[in-house]
Amino acid sequence: MTGCGMNSTNSGQPDEPGPGERSAEEVFTEFMDAMEDTVQHSGANWPNWDRQDTSGYFPPPCSVRTRDDGRAYQTQIEGGPVDDPQAAVDHMKAHWKSKGYTIGNIFDDVNPATGMQINARTPRGMLVQFSPTRNGSLIKVVGECTLDPAARKKTT
């Protein structure tokens, strides 16, 4: 999401790092954990996802203080179908709420496959999106923006 606005907050806690101040390692771990958590609670099969494979991520620019001064890890993965997209969205919504996520837009019938899409934000502003359909499913996560120069390198 080149040129996107700030997506990092500190939840108003005085002892937490402010926007962009967390290390690339911290935000990458949280990003990967959010992917894994969503995969585990999706009800779909994700044959191309491996939480242990951390190589090849090169985060595009994001903005913390000035345009494109940070980096945010992001990816989208494709998975198998779900029999009941509504039930899958309801389950994910309840799960995300239990984790303190803010539930955003929920779309139904977003494509010819009669699927759905649910969007949420973590307490630190990471975007998590789950789109289950009867033909296949998608998960997209856009991590927290970090100013750490280490995030400018492709993960290995």
Sequence positions of predicted segments:
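Intrinsically disordered/low-complexity terminal segments and short unstructured peptides
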Residues: 1, 8, 85, 154-155
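N-terminal leader/targeting segments
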Residues: 2-68
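Active-site oxyanion-binding pockets that recognize sulfate/phosphate
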Residues: 21-24, 78, 82
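C-terminal basic regulatory modules in eukaryotic proteins
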Residues: 27-34, 142-156
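Extracellular/mature segments of secreted proteins
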Residues: 68-75, 152-155
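Extracytosolic low-complexity repeat regions of secreted or lipid-anchored proteins
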Residues: 80-144
